[in-house]
Amino acid sequence: MNWELLLWLLVLCALLLLLVQLLRFLRADGDLTLLWAEWQGRRPEWELTDMVVWVTGASSGIGEELAYQLSKLGVSLVLSARRVHELERVKRRCLENGNLKEKDILVLPLDLTDTGSHEAATKAVLQEFGRIDILVNNGGMSQRSLCMDTSLDVYRKLIELNYLGTVSLTKCVLPHMIERKQGKIVTVNSILGIISVPLSIGYCASKHALRGFFNGLRTELATYPGIIVSNICPGPVQSNIVENSLAGEVTKTIGNNGDQSHKMTTSRCVRLMLISMANDLKEVWISEQPFLLVTYLWQYMPTWAWWITNKMGKKRIENFKSGVDADSSYFKIFKTKHD
C-alpha cells in the first residue's frame, strides 16, 4: 500500500470537509450550537406546551410574532406593552390562528419605565394563572443618531427602558421562580450587546449592560439549576424597531423603516428563539451574514473584529446620511432566504 498516497487522500478529504463546513457557515443564520439544537435538539412543540409565558413588548415586531407562534403551541399567554389597542389586536389574531381560548390570554398593559407598577403587574399574572413559567424580556427601544448630535436624555431613556425596566421586572418575577425552583428568564438582547457600532452607541451600551447583568445573575442562581437564564442576541430583523428608534432627542423618532427586505424575517428569528428556549441554551446569536461572522470575530479574534467593524461602521454612517437603512449594503453577497 502506498502510505504517502493514502496520507494525501486523507488530507484532501479533510480540506474538502473544511471547505463544506465553511460554505455552510457562510449561509448560516445562527450560531453553531443553536443550529445543532435545531437539527438534533428538543422541539418547542414538545417542551413549551401548557406553560405560562409572559411576553413584554408584545404589541409589535419580535414580541408580536412570538405571541403568534406561542399561541400555536398551547401555552397560556400574558401580553404586555404600553399600547392596549395593539395588544388587543395581537390577542384577536392569536385566538383566530392559534390553539388558545379567551381564558388562555391575558392582556396586561405595562410601561417598563414605570418600575413602581411592576410588582402589581406580577401579582396580576400570578392571580390569573397561578404561576409564571417563562418571562420573555422583549420590550425596548433602539437609537439612530451620532453621539455629538444626541441629547444625554436619549441615553438616559435607553438605560431606563432597555436596562433598568427589564431588571426591575425580572426582580419582581424572580422570587416566584426561586420559590418553585424552576422557570426560564429569556431576555431578547442583541448582537449589539456583544459588538458595538456607530449611530446606536446608546442602544449598544444598554444591551451590553443587560448581557452583563444576566450573565452574572445566571451565576448567582447556580444553586437553582431549574431556573434557566437565556440571552437571545438577534441581528437585523424585519420589524418596526428602526421606525421607532430615537433620533437626537427623546421627542423625535426616525419615523421610517425603509427597505427591510435584506433583513432576517421575524418568523425565522422567533422560530430560532423557541428552539433556544426549548433547549435551555444560555446564549444564542441569531443573525445572517456578515453580522454573524463579525460576532464570532468579536468573541474570538477581537483585533480582526476592530478592523472589520471600522470598515463597516463607515459604510453604516454613509447609508444613514444618504437616507437608506444603515445596514442595507452588507447583505448582498451573503443573503439567504429561510422559510
From Swiss-Prot:
Q: In which tissues is it expressed?
A: Found predominantly in the adrenal glands, liver, thyroid, prostate, small intestine, colon, stomach, kidney and brain. Lower levels observed in skeletal muscle, the lung and the spleen.
Query: Which residues are recorded as binding substrate?
Result: 190
Principal localization reads: endoplasmic reticulum
Q: Which Gene3D superfamilies match?
A: NAD(P)-binding Rossmann-like Domain
> Pfam families in the record, alphabetically?
adh_short (PF00106)
Q: Where in the cell is it found?
A: Endoplasmic reticulum membrane
The molecular function GO annotations come to: all-trans-retinol dehydrogenase (NADP+) activity; carbonyl reductase (NADPH) activity; oxidoreductase activity, acting on the CH-OH group of donors, NAD or NADP as acceptor
Residues at the catalytic site:
203
Q: Which residues bind NAD(+)?
A: 60, 62, 203, 207, 239
Which keywords does the record carry? Endoplasmic reticulum, Membrane, NAD, NADP, Oxidoreductase, Signal
* Cellular component per GO, a single term: endoplasmic reticulum membrane
Keyword Secreted appears in the UniProt entry: no
The family database entries (CDD domains) matched by this protein are listed as: 11beta-HSD1_like_SDR_c
The Enzyme Commission number assigned here is 1.1.1.-
Q: Which residues form the signal peptide?
A: 1-28
Instruction: Enumerate the SUPFAM superfamilies for this protein.
Output: NAD(P)-binding Rossmann-fold domains
Catalysed reaction(s) here are: all-trans-retinol + NADP(+) = all-trans-retinal + NADPH + H(+); 5alpha-androstane-3alpha,17beta-diol + NADP(+) = 17beta-hydroxy-5alpha-androstan-3-one + NADPH + H(+)
What's this protein's family per the entry? Belongs to the short-chain dehydrogenases/reductases (SDR) family.
Outline what the protein does.
NADPH-dependent oxidoreductase which catalyzes the reduction of a variety of compounds bearing carbonyl groups including steroids, retinoids and xenobiotics. Catalyzes the reduction/inactivation of 5alpha-dihydrotestosterone to 3alpha-androstanediol, with a possible role in the modulation of androgen receptor function. Involved in the reduction of all-trans-retinal to all-trans-retinol. Converts cortisone to 20beta-dihydrocortisone in vitro, although the physiological relevance of this activity is questionable.
Q: Which PANTHER family match?
A: DEHYDROGENASE/REDUCTASE SDR FAMILY MEMBER 7-RELATED, DEHYDROGENASE_REDUCTASE SDR FAMILY MEMBER 7
Name of protein: Dehydrogenase/reductase SDR family member 7
Question: Which organism does this sequence originate in?
Answer: Homo sapiens (Human)
Gene encoding the protein = DHRS7
